[in-house]
Every structure is written in structure tokens, then in C-alpha cells.
Amino acid sequence: MYQSSHGSHDHDNGLFAQHDYALSPPRPTLDGEPRYECMPVGFYYADVSRIDRFDDYDTRQAAYWSLLAGACGHTYGNNNVWQFLQPGREPVLWANIRWQASLDTPGAFQMGLVRRLFESRPFTKLVPNVAMLLGEAPAGGAKVRAACASDGSFAIIYSAQGEPFTVDRNVIRARRLREIWYDPRYGCSYLLHSTDSRGYQTYTPPTSGRGQDWVLIIEDADQGFPLPNSPK
């Protein structure tokens, strides 16, 4: 288990999972304390700003980066919830919202969407696959991460800021491909198309910029996987 902590925006916690996954033999690993929603960024630094806090985007970014780099799961935290902030209790680290209300913050809701996405496909088959991303993939806070099922039945690619990326679709072993955009903010799925074509393809997410992260699913259309977040 690793602790990527609360030092800065865009800290690539996937690097910890990537390191652990490369060990032999690979064992389960996860981020036991990623950036907490509503936590002041870098609260342990002398020049900390009480205004600059991690939001739902920060928590989503940490979840997808870690999971697609090989983590076996993920944890979520909220600065107001862990200390059960309520009237009469002294706030720690500038907590400012009652813990009951913080249970319904956007990041908390979106962690459920993360879970539903990965549980809608055989999650344990996923293997990190940076090699399927071609060319100069976006770096820094816009980093793109990808993982592919060991049997080639599906792949999941996360563009942290909606930047375009190019994929080698030959890693998907299928007669016909289905491609889906998944909105990690609201859990909506948008069927891009089904195709018989292979080879390299560049994808441009529907929106871009900080907070405009998108997930692309490329899969074997004949597997009959449900749309992520669809009613069971």
C-alpha cells in the first residue's frame, strides 16, 4: 500500500502503482491515502492557502490514474468526514462543512461511478498497457493512462484533461469493436460507434481542460458488456 498524500494538484499517484506492479511477483497494491476532497492543498507547507482545496476532479484523477496503473482498488477521503466535523467540535486542517453534508459532495458521488465502471467489466483481467498509446501522449496533469484486458476483450483509457490521444486498436482481439465515451462526472455513456476496422486511431474527447476528464472504452462488441452505470 502507498500514500500519495495531499501535497499538490496533478501529483501522479499512478507511478506508485506502476512501481509495485512491476515487482516480481506482482501483489495487490493500492493508494491508502490519496488527495482528500475539501483538503487544503499542501496543508503541511508553510505557505499553505486555505482557499486552494482539492475538489472532485482531483479525487477522480487520482482514482483513475492509480487503477489504470495496476492498483487492485482505491480509497477516498474527505477532510470534513474523517474528523466528523460538526458544531461544537474544533475543526482540524481548516475543515469547514458538517460531515453529514460532506457525504454528498461531488467526489463522493463520483467514486461510486468509478466503481460501477470497473465492475461493469472483468476488472481482474486488466493489465496496465502504456504501449497501446502511440506518439507523444499528453504529460503532466493531462496525462493519459490505459489498461487492457489480458485476453484482449476490452481496454479502458483515461484522458485526465480531455486531450487527444492515439491508440493501437490491434491490442483488442475482436471481430468487431465497440467504442464508448464515459463521462466520469455524471456516469453517462455515449456510444461512439461499432467498427470492423483495426490499426491506429486518434481520439478527441468531447471537451477539454482542467476538470474535463474522459474515459474511453474500446471492447469486443460480441462480448455483450452492458453500458457502464446502466441499471442491472
Regions found by a protein language model. Give the residues of each.
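Substrate-binding/catalytic cleft of secreted carbohydrate-active enzymes
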Residues: 1-64
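Aromatic- and carboxylate-lined catalytic core of secreted/periplasmic carbohydrate-active enzymes
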Residues: 25, 37-39, 55-193, 206-232
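Short strand-edge motifs at loop-to-beta-strand transitions and within beta-strands
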Residues: 201-203
